[in-house]
Amino acid sequence: MSLANLRTHYTADVRPDKVENGQKVTLAGWVHEVRDLGGICFVVLRDREGKAQVTLVKKKIDKDLFDAARRLVRESVISVTGSVKFEEKAPNGYELLPDEINVLNVSGSPLPMDTTGKVEAELDTRLDSRFIDLRRAETTAVFKIRHESLRAIREYFVKYNFIETATPKVVATATEGGTALFPITYFDREAFLNQSPQLFKQILMSGGFDRVFEIGPIFRAEEHDTRRHLNEATSIDVEVSFADHFDVMELLENLVAYVYTRVIENCKSSLEVLGVDLKVPKTPFLKLTYDEVIEIINSRCEEKMHWGDDLGTLGEHTVGDHVYETTGESHYFIIDWPTEIKPFYAMPYEDRPEFSKSFDMMHRTMELSSGAQRIHIPSLLKNRIESQGLNPDGFEFYLKAFEFGMPPHAGWGMGCERFVMTMLGTENIRDTVLFPRDRRRLSP
């Protein structure tokens, strides 16, 4: 058989509106299950889109074909040509009566893990054998939804006249200061894997690009070992000229609603596989000031939060529960953070410089995004760099862009994995990335 003839349809494409009863089709995929009942044999073929039942009745079919089907090894790769018989009780509403079964590759045995869902596997086992785990319907569904989310994000930004960019991931200096960087050797110099495209996004504002977005990897050398942290992640970043923090908050909340809408419209079967009943968040999202957040936490928790503290995990859950109980919504903003606990490029308020024009977009369970109006005045920016104990000389390439006409601008960054995780209610962020990198895992 020619490779071009190994498949005519995906399993989900065999439907009464596309295929006639009795029509010949060829499906290709993996042997999900074989059920030999003596006089009848069922082979469940699985591909990316679902499953199809191949039915062989001993008295009605060639003996060699029947015996070959009975001997099929689970997870072997096969191509099956046969006639479609629509049957409500069969998987996907039809069965395939085969004329030919081609075994393209025989699977080894025993399998590293079960793909049918009958035997649960721990996350580490699944990640160690990711090539098998990716064949599970639940795993595939997560990545179909992630794909649709990123497609919708690009669609949204193109609709609003954004330019997609790609900035360096190998840099000479820290983006936001601190030590959470992975050092690498760059010929005869020390360099780092970039922790954020922040500085480059701002340079693009000086370059007149006006509205940019980027979807790309970021690297954080933080020794977290939690269900919601990764050391390599995908960041969705935005920067907008002639805008303040309220403008980009509106952009962000509308993006979230847009993506949820697209996922609901285009990922019905994947959501069904995961048992997720997705609802579009209502906009505008509630905005709480940093001071209001302190009041909420201190009224509900024994462990008090003080002005100048960052928000810990307990605080995030406490405020998230409060918002959900009072509004029925999971997304909200925290605004007006203390200047000193935000990055040096966050713009302070002119009349109360101890507060910054910054925000975090929160989910009921965790932070999803952080953003701000940026400082565009060179002297103020340099002072803020120095006030955080950083050397302006290390940011020369960045500061130059502010000396020759930098417009007011604002932006944000959002982690793709956390966004998908909270959308689907996934327990561990590692389930939302194909090959996760954390402090313990560097392979596969």
From Swiss-Prot:
Keywords: Aminoacyl-tRNA synthetase, ATP-binding, Cytoplasm, Ligase, Magnesium, Metal-binding, Nucleotide-binding, Protein biosynthesis. The lineage of its organism: Archaea, Methanobacteriati, Methanobacteriota, Stenosarchaea group, Methanomicrobia. Belongs to the class-II aminoacyl-tRNA synthetase family. Type 2 subfamily. ATP binds at residues 220-222, 228-230, 367, 415-418. Its main location: cytoplasm. Binds 3 Mg(2+) cations per subunit. The strongest magnesium site (Mg1) is bound to the beta- and gamma-phosphates of ATP and four water molecules complete its coordination sphere. L-aspartate binds at residues 176, 220, 370, 374. Gene3D superfamilies: Bira Bifunctional Protein, Domain 2, Nucleic acid-binding proteins. It comes from Methanosarcina mazei (strain ATCC BAA-159 / DSM 3647 / Goe1 / Go1 / JCM 11833 / OCM 88). Homodimer. This is Aspartate--tRNA(Asp/Asn) ligase. Mg(2+) 2 binds at residues 367, 370. PROSITE patterns: AA_TRNA_LIGASE_II (PS50862). It is found in: Cytoplasm. Pfam families: tRNA-synt_2, tRNA_anti-codon. Its EC number is 6.1.1.23. NCBIfam families: aspS_nondisc, PRK05159.1. One of its GO terms (cellular component) is aminoacyl-tRNA synthetase multienzyme complex. GO terms for biological process: aspartyl-tRNA aminoacylation. The gene is aspS. The record marks 91 as: Important for tRNA non-discrimination. Mg(2+) 3 binds at residue 367.
